[in-house]
């Protein structure tokens, strides 16, 4: 399915080289102020820097066709369309499946009728519509003091400082919104860009790790067992092309700790509010928010489109062959994924709010 969510839902339509891509966001409360300049900013961030991004340069001019009136959401489905203006289909072969892409699985899923150009419906290009819609969900949350931010934690063997060192502050998260390359440490950013450039020159690509924080969530959001925050957010994050892993808080490192090391002890802050001394559980206990920042990390695989010669199979002849991918592709999709993760996370959190507080939570 190309639909995310239960009560606040996002449906994506379109193909990489089709005429347009569309997102329909349903279930968002009425009265949310829509900042089109904020949407434009996030779409610019998704386009990325020239070092890591694809040479395909789409203007990403968007049209809001429904669900917004006089600058505010109406409470009815929001339809956003972005037209494709810079597609080049000349480099794509219908029968040679590209290693690491969904070409092979799509061939069997859709019996050979799939649009293979640029990955079709599986392309990261579709995420532009996702970001436009998700930014409106972020608007709804920001009005309530809930801020989401993601930085590149690791790329090309170079690590940025984690949120944990200085705490996931709202100021840090807001700072990330102005970054086209979301890295706190300037020297780390410089070294990451060098690694990406080297991979591109070698005809190769890099994977990476992104770290996300949600600040301002109230206690009690989420459900036990199968409706927990981890599961709801992970469902959305795993829908993003290239995502191969998600961990919350200390994640897999918890498996190597003792209980005395892993447990987040409770204390009172200066305002007599209950907080935890550490945040190994990432702000979630029993699937429910505990009031601390929700922290999670996402693993992004290397861009599968590389210019090195690779072995494959020609599906029209069922013979082994070789393929060289000559299209315009990212050297590191992780560099552009931060804003996509923010957008998906915002939609998931809005869905969780609606489940707990009903459809008018943003205006009440």
Show where each model-derived region lies:
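N-terminal, positively charged regions that mediate nucleic acid binding
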Residues: 1-57
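Internal helix-turn-beta structural module
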Residues: 9, 80, 305-364
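A short glycine/serine-rich beta->alpha loop
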Residues: 9-14, 114-126, 219-223, 279-284, ...
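Glycine-rich anion/phosphate-binding loop at the beta-strand->alpha-helix junction
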Residues: 12-13, 19, 203-320
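Alpha-helical support elements that line or immediately flank enzyme active sites
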Residues: 19-31, 124-146, 150, 227-235, ...
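Glycine-rich, N-terminal phosphate-binding loop and its surrounding beta-alpha-beta segment
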Residues: 42-105
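Short acidic, glycine/tyrosine-flanked loop/strand segments centered on an H-E-D-like triad
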Residues: 95-120, 311-329
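Glycine-rich, mobile lid/loop segments that gate access to catalytic sites or pores
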Residues: 109-225
């Amino acid at each position: 399915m190309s639909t995310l969510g239960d009560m606040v839902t996002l449906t994506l339509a379109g193909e990489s080289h089709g005429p347009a891509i569309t997102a329909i966001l349903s279930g968002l409360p009425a009265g949310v102020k829509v900042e089109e300049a904020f949407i434009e900013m996030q779409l610019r961030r998704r386009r990325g820097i020239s070092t890591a991004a694809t040479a395909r340069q789409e203007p990403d001019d968007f049209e809001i066709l429904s669900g917004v009136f006089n600058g505010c959401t109406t409470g009815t489905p929001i339809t956003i369309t972005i037209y494709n203006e810079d597609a080049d289909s000349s480099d794509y072969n219908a029968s040679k499946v590209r290693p690491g892409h969904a070409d092979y699985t799509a061939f069997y899923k859709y019996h050979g009728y799939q649009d293979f150009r640029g990955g079709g419906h599986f392309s990261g290009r579709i995420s532009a519509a996702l970001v436009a819609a998700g930014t409106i969900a972020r608007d709804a949350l920001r009005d309530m003091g809930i801020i989401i931010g993601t930085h590149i934690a690791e790329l090309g063997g170079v690590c940025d400082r984690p949120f944990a060192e200085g705490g996931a502050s709202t100021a840090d998260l807001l700072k990330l919104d102005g970054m086209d390359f979301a890295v706190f440490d300037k020297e780390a950013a410089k070294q990451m860009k060098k690694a990406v450039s080297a991979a591109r020159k070698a005809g190769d690509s890099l994977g990476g790790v992104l770290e996300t924080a949600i600040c301002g969530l109230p206690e009690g959001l989420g459900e036990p067992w199968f409706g927990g925050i981890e599961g709801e957010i992970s469902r959305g994050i795993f829908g993003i092309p290239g995502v191969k892993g998600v961990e919350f808080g200390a994640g897999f490192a918890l498996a190597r700790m003792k209980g005395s090391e892993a447990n987040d002890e409770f204390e009172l802050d200066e305002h007599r509010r209950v907080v935890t001394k550490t945040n190994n559980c990432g702000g979630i206990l029993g699937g429910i928010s505990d009031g601390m920042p929700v922290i999670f990390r996402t693993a992004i695989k290397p861009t599968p489109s590389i210019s090195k010669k690779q072995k494959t199979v020609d599906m029209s002849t069922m013979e082994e062959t070789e393929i060289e991918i000559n299209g315009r592709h990212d050297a590191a999709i992780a560099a552009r994924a931060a804003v996509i993760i923010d957008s998906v996370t915002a939609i998931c959190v809005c869905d969780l709010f609606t489940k707990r507080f009903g459809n008018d939570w943003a205006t009440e």
